């Protein structure tokens, strides 16, 4: 059984980011396929309420959000690095651009373009996730503007590649490539007509093909039931708590995203740093697990 389990589904753009990172590192991992829409009972048993994809599981440690998954992969499996030129902080900060600004443009283009072809069950699910409207008609009206915005964003990548480099930071692939690739992969996969926004930009097509050719590492299929059994039989890692969180140490807290998908996760604070927050919780199916969240984009309340 692979040590790394990735709870994912094939069409998830954020899962694709992590799959590319696994490919860069050449890691073996288990794909635990989750439903695209709720309910997701096995995933919720592990996370305590967090429903977004992907989630990485290593034993009884559950890592939520792609930004923290990247950090944990690099910590546990440092070579080959996702930061071949260093610049760790700067490159990780690019996720705030790709995961928010560029991703929102991609969502509007894809679902605005698909329009009435988007299943009603999917719309209802995403409205529950967002806590607001998922209006494909409004997205459709915004498509011309968003196509222009997307082209301008991708033109920055073309500018970076203009000196003939193989990948965005040099001759070796890294997180900058995975971050910048997945939204374009998402558009190509979900709504190919929109690739006209970037296909004619110089260097982009060849770079996309080079990133695609990296692959996804060594993948095996793992059932959701098997993943739960692994969690139940494992012991989570111990942690330390940062000074700024000392008042919450050993106490019940609530963690929630501050953008969308704000489902609260409750547990005892057992670890934190400038980069993460960890809570221990008990589940009748999954057993004792520690659920880890990134610090950026998440709130902690007592």
Can you say where each PLM-predicted feature lies in the sequence?
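Charged, low-complexity, helix-prone segments enriched in Lys/Glu/Asp/Gln
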Residues: 91, 95, 126, 146, ...
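Short, hydrophobic secondary-structure boundary micro-motifs
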Residues: 82-85, 168-170, 220-221
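Conserved RNA-binding domains used in RNP assembly and mRNA/RNA metabolism
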Residues: 219-302
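GST-like domain detector, emphasizing the conserved glutathione-binding G-site
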Residues: 1-129, 136-137, 266-270, 277-302
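Short linear motifs at secondary-structure transitions and domain/linker junctions
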Residues: 29-40, 154-157, 228-232, 253-256
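GST-like fold's C-terminal all-alpha helical module
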Residues: 98-213
């Amino acid at each position: 059984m692979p040590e790394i389990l990735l709870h994912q589904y094939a069409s998830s753009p954020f899962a694709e980011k992590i799959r590319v990172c696994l490919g860069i590192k050449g890691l073996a991992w288990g794909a635990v396929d989750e439903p695209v829409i709720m309910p997701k009972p096995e995933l919720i048993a592990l996370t305590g309420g967090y429903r977004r994809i992907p989630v990485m599981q290593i034993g009884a440690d559950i890592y939520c959000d792609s930004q923290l998954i990247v950090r944990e992969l690099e910590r546990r499996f440092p070579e080959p690095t996702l930061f071949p030129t260093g610049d760790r902080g700067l490159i990780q900060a690019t996720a705030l651009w790709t995961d928010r600004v560029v991703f929102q443009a991609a969502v509007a283009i894809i679902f605005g373009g698909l329009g009435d072809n988007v299943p009603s069950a999917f719309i209802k699910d995403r409205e529950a996730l967002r806590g607001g409207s998922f209006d494909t008609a409004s997205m459709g009206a915004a498509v011309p503007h968003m196509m222009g915005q997307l082209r301008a964003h991708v033109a920055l990548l073309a500018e970076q590649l203009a000196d003939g480099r193989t990948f965005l930071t040099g001759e070796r692939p890294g997180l900058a490539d995975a971050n910048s690739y997945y939204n374009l992969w998402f558009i190509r996969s979900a709504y190919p007509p929109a690739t006209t926004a970037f296909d004619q930009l110089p260097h982009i097509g060849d770079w996309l093909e080079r990133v695609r050719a990296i692959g996804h590492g060594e993948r095996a299929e793992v059932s959701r039931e098997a993943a739960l059994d692994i969690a139940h039989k494992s012991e989570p890692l111990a942690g330390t708590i940062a000074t700024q969180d000392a008042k919450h140490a050993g106490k019940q807290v609530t963690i929630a995203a501050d953008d969308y998908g704000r489902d609260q996760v409750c547990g005892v604070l057992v670890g934190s740093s400038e980069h993460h927050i960890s809570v221990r919780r008990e589940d009748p199916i999954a057993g004792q697990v520690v659920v880890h969240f990134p610090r950026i984009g998440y709130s902690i309340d007592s």
